[in-house]
Design a protein with these regions (language model features):
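Fold-level signature of zinc-dependent metallopeptidase catalytic domains
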Residues: 1-12
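Metzincin-family zinc-dependent endopeptidase catalytic domain
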Residues: 10-117, 129
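Metalloprotease/metallohydrolase-associated module, dominated by Zn2+-dependent proteases
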Residues: 87-113, 129-170
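Conserved phosphoacceptor histidine of two-component systems
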Residues: 120
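Short active-site segment of divalent metal-dependent hydrolases/proteases
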Residues: 123-124
Length: 170
């Protein structure tokens, strides 16, 4: 089950469409679990890693994945290749990820790029690595073409995610 937790207010119809997209991509249930508040004192732009640590936990089963959705800006990250914009962060192979819809008026206007970032971060939770296919949601998100793509996986990444999900269920 993918549990979507909002840290800011979003339209319920848009969240339902967002959850359906996650269900279509992964083949597991997806639901909006609720809206939580970020603890006071977190400076903006948010440090994605610290925000994941600070936010209140969600009641979930061991194989559930929790996706936090915020409209606040996330702090850029330093990588060996340089500074990259951060539209999301996940703990590889773990259970929590965060993405932002910053730069889009609402979830409907920015649906494709936000959904694509969601698939990307959730893919990391199921231990998917970056993909070389620019049409795939696991393509590196800091590339210029990433936001224009559809929220889908290539055949290889889809099969690998399905395999990981099946293993988690058994």
């Amino acid at each position: 089950m993918i549990r979507v937790v909002t840290l800011d207010s979003y339209d319920e119809k848009q969240l339902a469409k967002f959850s359906r997209t996650l269900y279509t991509a992964f083949g597991v249930g997806s639901e909006h679990t609720g809206q939580f508040e970020l603890p006071a004192g977190l400076p903006e732009p948010l440090d994605a890693e610290k925000a994941l640590d600070a936010v209140k936990g969600v009641r979930a089963y061991k194989d559930d994945k929790v996706l936090y959705l915020t409209s606040r800006k996330l702090k850029e990250r330093e990588l060996p290749s340089g500074t990259v914009p951060t539209n999301g962060f996940s703990r590889f192979g773990k259970d929590k990820a965060i993405i932002t819809s910053v730069g889009h008026k609402d979830l409907e206007v920015g649906f494709k790029p936000v959904a694509r970032h969601a698939l990307h971060q959730l893919g990391h939770l199921w231990e998917l690595h970056h993909c070389l296919d620019p049409r795939c949601s696991m393509y590196p998100p800091w590339t210029p073409s990433f936001a224009a793509g559809e929220p889908t996986f290539c055949t290889f990444c889809r099969e690998k995610s399905e395999q990981k999900i099946r293993l988690a269920k058994s």
